[in-house]
């Protein structure tokens, strides 16, 4: 038997994939230049072309609340089961949440 991979990006073949019309390394500048304030709701939408600040696959598509900023990245509080976790995500992997 072949040993299953245990890497950080394993089981991400379809999650970290761009559709045909989204291909390219540069994210839309309108999404990157948004300045989020603490308390803003955001959707974690990973851009697989940019590896820095990429969140774990467990948090893909989750809605979180911006807690603060650390360097260029944002601290986002996300619910994972019964526990709230604070993750560090770069703005290329965030979208504003519209209610």
Curated annotation (Swiss-Prot):
Q: Name one GO cellular component term.
A: ribosome
Pfam families membership: Ribosomal_L21e
Entry's InterPro entries?
A: Ribosomal_eL21, Ribosomal_eL21_arc, Ribosomal_eL21_CS, Ribosomal_eL21_sf, Translation_prot_SH3-like_sf
What span is annotated as the signal peptide, if there is one? none
UniProt cross-references to Gene3D superfamilies, sorted A to Z: Ribosomal protein L21 (2.30.30.70)
Q: Which PROSITE patterns match?
A: RIBOSOMAL_L21E
GO terms (molecular function) for this protein are: structural constituent of ribosome
- The identity of this protein, by name, is Large ribosomal subunit protein eL21
Top-rank lineage group of the source organism: Archaea
Q: Which family does it belong to?
A: Belongs to the eukaryotic ribosomal protein eL21 family.
**Would you kindly state one Gene Ontology biological process term found in this protein's UniProt entry?**
translation
Gene, per the UniProt record: rpl21e
- The entry's keywords: Ribonucleoprotein, Ribosomal protein
Q: Which organism is it from?
A: Ignicoccus hospitalis (strain KIN4/I / DSM 18386 / JCM 14125)
Stored SUPFAM superfamilies: Translation proteins SH3-like domain
Q: Give the source lineage, highest ranks first.
A: Archaea, Thermoproteota, Thermoprotei, Desulfurococcales, Desulfurococcaceae
């Amino acid at each position: 038997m072949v040993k299953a991979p245990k890497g950080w990006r394993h089981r991400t073949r379809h999650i970290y994939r761009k559709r045909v019309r989204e291909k390219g390394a540069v994210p839309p500048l309108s999404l990157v230049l948004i300045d989020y304030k603490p308390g803003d709701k955001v959707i974690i939408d990973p851009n697989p072309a940019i590896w820095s600040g990429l969140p774990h696959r467990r948090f893909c598509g989750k809605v979180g609340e911006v807690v603060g900023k650390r360097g260029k990245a944002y601290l986002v509080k996300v619910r994972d089961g019964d526990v709230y976790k604070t993750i560090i995500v770069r703005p290329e992997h965030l979208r504003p949440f519209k209610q």
